[in-house]
Structure formats: structure tokens, C-alpha cells
Amino acid sequence: MNQLLREVLTPDAERTQNFTVGDTVKVHYKIVESGKERVQIYEGVVISVANEANGKTFTVRRVSYDVGVERIFPLFSPRIAKIELIRKGKVRRAKLYYLRNLAGKAARIKELKGGKALVSEDRKRQQAAAATKSTTTE
């Protein structure tokens, strides 16, 4: 059974995890409502990455109207259109659950030195992957 799952859920080059805990990401998530499909963008800080291989999930937290909202996404879900890296965070923990108890400026995460270069490098890689994907489908 695991071998079958591995074959079905083989990670794409664009779907490999290019973010870690503490990074700010935009998750483009497909939502189907009454037969229509639309993409919803969810932006926030990755506070945890769980599991391994094909069952890997990550939790994204954001504050919306002074209320903390957390959402767990499966990394290899077909409903995720793309994951965009916004900024790299400098953290020293594997799980950032302590952010739940912090508010305002205390809940900010410092940006990693050289993080902007990593983000621009990641965007170029995603654009190249999208370009090769569009040329192969035509």
C-alpha cells in the first residue's frame, strides 16, 4: 500500500518543500463552491512542519481582525495550487507554538540575513518551473 501511495503522490520539483518553520508564505489553495473553482490565498507564518514523506503537513498562522487563525495544509495536496515564499525567518525552534500567547510586536519574527536573496532565488526557480511546465503542456 505504501508503495502505491508513493507512486501516486510523487513530489513534483515545484512542490518540494522550499520553506522552513518561521518563514512567511502565501498558500494558493483551490476551493470548490457549488461547482465553481476559485483560488484563495492564505498568508501567514509557518509555525510547524509535521510528519515525513507523502503525508507531510505544515501549519500556517496569521492574525485576522485581532484573532489568531491557524490552518493545517497537506504539502502534497492536489488542492494547493502553489506555495509562495515571502520572507525567511530567523528562529531557533522546530515548533513556534509560543506565538499563540504573544500579541502585536512581540509576535514578530526577525528576518534571516541574506533571506531576501533566498526569496528572490526561490521565485526565479518557481518561474522557471512554471515556464517548463507550460512548454511541455503545449
Swiss-Prot record:
Sorted UniProt keywords: Ribonucleoprotein, Ribosomal protein
Coiled-coil residues: none
Pfam families in the cross-refs: Ribosomal_L19
Entry GO terms, CC: cytosolic large ribosomal subunit
Function: This protein is located at the 30S-50S ribosomal subunit interface and may play a role in the structure and function of the aminoacyl-tRNA binding site.
Family listed: Belongs to the bacterial ribosomal protein bL19 family.
Protein name, per record: Large ribosomal subunit protein bL19
Protein source organism: Leptospira interrogans serogroup Icterohaemorrhagiae serovar Lai (strain 56601)
Gene it is expressed from: rplS
